[in-house]
Amino acid sequence: MKVTLVTALYDINRDKKGDGRTFDEYLSWFAGTLKVKSPMVIFVDESLEEFVREHRKGLPTKIICQSLEEIPYYHLNDTIQNILDDEEYKSKISDPGRVECKMSLYNAVIFSKFRWVKRVIEENTFNSEYFMWMDAGLSRFFAPHGVNINLPYPSKNAQEVLLDSKDSVLIQATMNFYGDLVNAEVCDESYFLDNRSWVMAGLWGGGAEVLTKFCDMVDEVLQEKMIKNNVINNEQIVMAYLYKNNDDMFTVFENYTHMHRQYEIIAELQA
């Protein structure tokens, strides 16, 4: 079985307008992520095309060049910025200093990942049965978890497990924080104003049918439940909301590490 990975990177001046992370940092992490030995579809501005070709040399790769203005959710940029500038929103949202509460472009990019994955599934360039999103900067977690980029990823054993669960969406959840959220039977829309993210959005996947459905559900929550109600938050919040209200469509890797946001699932996929 082939697993197709999907990733993307765009310069949105995050260091100046967001949280201080520089694009050079992301390029160094991106270079590591691009070394993963799996078929990969990569969305970038044409200015990064040669960078991608250099770091994917000899690996099965499809590069799709889109300008920032062409990404799937750029058309929502002004609408999202109007929400972020709204005083009522600022007074209600938890931790308004977060990058997703200041930069509309950040939101346009992070939510576009779901449209990108859906497109990759539809085109299925590498005839895959399973698809995974991997954040461009995820390689910064490789070394701490012992991931060897010289070995197949996911491993043969991991691919067999993924294939067996291809009718569900694979996510990682951090279980030892926010007990009121983790242990709740359902999640209501008040969570859209929360700042506590416990479902990781940097690595997730599934088979074509369930993942397409999931991406459509994210779109519905974003546009119908958040934006129409003058609210915006990050994609991790939306993923947790969908999981809690549709738990039968998910396979959850439960992470009990003492450090928040450690992607233990990265190592498991090479075991």
Descriptions of predicted regions:
Residues 7, 103-112, 164, 194-200, ...:
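The feature represents the membrane-entry module of six-transmembrane cation channels
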Residues 1-101, 108, 112, 120-127:
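N-terminal anchoring/stem segment of glycosyltransferases
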Residues 13-15, 49-52, 71-74, 139-144, ...:
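Short catalytic/ligand-binding loop motif for oxyanion handling, primarily in non-cytosolic enzymes
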Residues 105, 109-171:
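GT-A fold catalytic core of metal-dependent nucleotide-sugar glycosyltransferases
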Residues 13-24, 143-151, 226-229:
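Short, flexible/disordered intra-domain loops and linkers
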Residues 140, 144, 177, 184-271:
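Catalytic core and acceptor-binding pocket of nucleotide-sugar-dependent glycosyltransferases
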Residues 150-195, 213:
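Extended hydrophobic/aromatic segments used for targeting, binding, or gating
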Residues 6, 41-44, 64, 130-135, ...:
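A structural signal for short, well-ordered beta-strand segments and their strand-loop junctions
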